[in-house]
Amino acid sequence: MLLVIDIGNTNTVFGIFEDQKLVRDWRIRTKRNTTEDELNVLLTGLFTGSSVALADISRAVIASVVPPVERIYSAFCKKYLRCTPQWVSPANCAGITIRYANPQEVGADRIVNAVGAHAKYQTDLIVVDFGTATTFDLVSADGAYEGGVIAPGIGISADALFSHASKLPRVDLMTVPETVVGKDTAGSIKSGIIFGYAGLVDGIVSRMITERGRPHKVIATGGLAPLIAGVSATIEAVEPNLTLEGLRIIGSSAE
């Protein structure tokens, strides 16, 4: 079986593939001060009750945007999985051409999303990923990563508002407001964040398409993708497992 790991600034996602089937997946908070032994305890616990054991894992593919933990994950794979992990990089991206001025600047998560999206759709694409940052990545029909846009993420933007405005309460961002015009402070904040980000998405996507001069299919991934997609005029599909699928494809291409 293949273990895929997406190490993000906020969350780390683990997925287990048997051939092309995603068997299980888990999302945890990213810890920068963990050890390979703690990772073993954590994953052993996650696997308990599932049909998978650590001994079933023969390979690992990892995408990371958190350099301080990479040595720890490498040590875990070597010590407990008896394998050397495959790390996603511009030189290891399943045939995707990177047309960035400096390919080394492209985050592994963005590369993986491009791989997964191109494999599924084979057309001009814009991939919107709602993570710690909200990223917009343009992938051409011929499988090239053309570049993109990086904006502050929904979570960190909301945190900045709450931390700098003492009288504003924290609000639940997991549901869409019934109306744009809020009737109380909490409703007004929620409306501003959710509809504001939908407007940001639609505005940036529209500008990207205008600049390119032709239609692009727009897909979204990340934790809040279903929420924003529901009020966006441009997002056409939500792919919750896009990053894991991209990691699987990169792993398969190296066999």
UniProtKB/Swiss-Prot annotation:
UniProt binding sites for substrate: Y100, G107, A108, D109, R110, T185
Name of the gene encoding the protein in the UniProt record: coaX
Residues annotated as catalytic: D109
Catalytic activity: (R)-pantothenate + ATP = (R)-4'-phosphopantothenate + ADP + H(+)
Localization per record: Cytoplasm
Gene Ontology terms, MF aspect: ATP binding; metal ion binding; pantothenate kinase activity
Protein name: Type III pantothenate kinase
Matches recorded under SUPFAM superfamilies: Actin-like ATPase domain
Cofactor(s) this protein requires: NH4(+); K(+)
